[in-house]
Amino acid sequence: DGTIEENTDAMSTYYRSIILAGPSAKGQELLAKVNNGEELTWDDLNSATWAVMGPTSASGYIYPSLWLQERYGKTIADLDNAVQSDSYTTSLARLASGQADVMVSFGHIRTKNAKDWKEKLGGTDEMVNQTGIIGVTEPIYNDMIAYSKNSELMQDEDFRKALGDSFIELAETDEGKEIFSVFSQIGYEWGDDANYDGERAAQELLKSLN
């Protein structure tokens, strides 16, 4: 819609991966279809050159593969033209130059790199004018505090609740914020086991690739 995504001060328990179309003719063709409300076909996507990360990258390979699998029964491994990049910066440079038609990355890639698009990456116009999102994955829940089901101590539900509440309360203090900032975390919420169904699917996908 002509605007770059904005960061938020609100706490989030997940992030998403996106499929980003670039300024090449093919990239703009795919973006135009999406903006017109048309469904992309597998042939549409397979006709593009993709810039991807290594197969262990959550946002740069695994979750985009799950997105493809859910819609087309395919993964990144099935694409005819998928080029592995050594960094997201490399993928962006390939996208800007037209070497790649689409790339996959963490969702805030444009927020982080809009300024560098023209100055350092080779874009010929503002990033918001040359790129567009054509796909968004399921949430990626990559940070959590977990417990072992084999622990006798953790069998006590009251203890688990008290421990969880302690982490939540500690993260709300200035001292706690300083401690948890080491992990780039700003707070905690109670989780839902169903939130991690996507991660279970990701693990199954990884097994199938081995």
Question: Each predicted region: which residue ranges?
Answer:
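Second-shell loop/turn segments in exported
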Residues: 5-6, 49-57, 81-82, 149-153, ...
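Short helix-initiation/N-cap motifs at beta->coil->alpha
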Residues: 76-93
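An extracytoplasmic/periplasmic, membrane-proximal ligand-sensing/linker region
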Residues: 152-210
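A ligand-binding cleft/hinge motif common to bilobed small-molecule-binding domains
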Residues: 67-70, 96-97, 101-128
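A conserved helix-loop-strand patch within extracytoplasmic ligand-binding domains
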Residues: 1-57
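Hydrophobic residues within well-ordered alpha-helices
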Residues: 45, 95-96
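Secondary-structure junction motif
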Residues: 57-67
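Periplasmic-binding protein-like
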Residues: 1-18, 120-161, 185-187
